[in-house]
Amino acid sequence: MPTINQLIRKGREKQLKRKKTPALQACPQRRGVCTRVYTTTPKKPNSALRKVARVRLTNAIEVTAYIGGEGHNLQEHSVVLIRGGRVKDLPGVRYHIVRGSLDTAGVADRRQGRSKYGAKRPK
């Protein structure tokens, strides 16, 4: 515990808050090019093949982004838009690919929560 005099001389040091999406550099989304599209397995209690892509952003940072929804059309050199948002059971995946924008197609036959998957309203 510092004395009053020590606090007057030095003051308290501000605790810095770690950013959750540093690669976006305070932008809402960022554009990038897929360098690798592959599947990974999630952490311990879960089991699946999660679709992810390694993306090189326009600011030259390379990140791993999750491809949400059922089925996708992404391959190497696809231009994608990424947003923040981690995937809890995939370590190191802190970004999501925005469906229905740039080269990413929306999810086909999606009826509920369509706006999150870039799906048009069914007739």
From Swiss-Prot:
Highest taxon of the lineage: Bacteria
UniProt entry keywords in alphabetical sequence: Methylation, Ribonucleoprotein, Ribosomal protein, RNA-binding, rRNA-binding, tRNA-binding
PROSITE patterns: RIBOSOMAL_S12
GO molecular function: rRNA binding; structural constituent of ribosome; tRNA binding
CDD domains in UniProt: Ribosomal_S12 (cd03368)
GO terms classed as biological process: translation
Residues found modified as 3-methylthioaspartic acid: D89
Gene Ontology CC, one term: small ribosomal subunit
Ribosomal protein recorded as keyword: yes
One Pfam family per UniProt: Ribosom_S12_S23
Family (UniProt): Belongs to the universal ribosomal protein uS12 family.
Function: With S4 and S5 plays an important role in translational accuracy. Interacts with and stabilizes bases of the 16S rRNA that are involved in tRNA selection in the A site and with the mRNA backbone. Located at the interface of the 30S and 50S subunits, it traverses the body of the 30S subunit contacting proteins on the other side and probably holding the rRNA structure together. The combined cluster of proteins S8, S12 and S17 appears to hold together the shoulder and platform of the 30S subunit.
Listed NCBIfam families: rpsL_bact
Quaternary structure and partners: Part of the 30S ribosomal subunit. Contacts proteins S8 and S17. May interact with IF1 in the 30S initiation complex.
Protein name: Small ribosomal subunit protein uS12
